[in-house]
């Protein structure tokens, strides 16, 4: 699981030009979108960004909150890696937000399918 500064987190009002740089720098293919209070409001993948760029003429100035997927899939920090992998396979996604037991709207980490596969846990 990636934690702290390794998590690609942005605020809802960030412009796409800056979001694109962050998703590229963090190399996870995903951005977690947070409200001002730190609660997670959405997610955007690199695939989403490619599709959005083709749709909108003024892509660079677009705010991420207008195109993010709301209520991203998340797991409790105590969830087994095999369970997380199963969820990713079922939902056909590559990343899950991770939260503390009592704070399901506050992302504390992100787990990527490759992290699980590289650790040989399945």
Language model regions located:
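The conserved cystathionine-beta-synthase
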Residues: 9-27, 35, 53-56, 74-94, ...
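Conserved active-site beta-strand-loop modules that form the wall/rim of enzyme catalytic pockets
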Residues: 28-31, 41-42
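Histidine- and aromatic-rich ligand-binding microenvironments
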Residues: 15, 48-49, 66, 115-116
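Short hydrophobic beta-strand motif reused across regulatory alpha/beta modules
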Residues: 42-47, 108-116
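Bateman (tandem CBS) regulatory domains
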Residues: 1-7, 61-72
């Amino acid at each position: 699981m990636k934690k702290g500064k390794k998590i690609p987190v942005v605020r809802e009002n960030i412009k796409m030009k800056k979001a694109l740089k962050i998703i590229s720098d963090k190399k996870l293919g995903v951005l977690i979108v947070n409200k001002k209070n730190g609660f997670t409001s959405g997610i955007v993948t690199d695939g989403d960004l490619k599709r959005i760029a083709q749709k909108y003429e003024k892509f660079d100035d677009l705010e991420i909150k207008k195109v993010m997927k709301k209520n991203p899939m998340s797991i409790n920090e105590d969830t087994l890696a095999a369970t997380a992998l199963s969820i990713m396979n079922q939902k056909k996604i590559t990343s899950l937000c991770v939260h503390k037991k009592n704070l399901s709207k506050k992302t504390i980490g992100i787990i990527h399918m490759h992290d699980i596969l590289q650790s040989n846990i399945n």
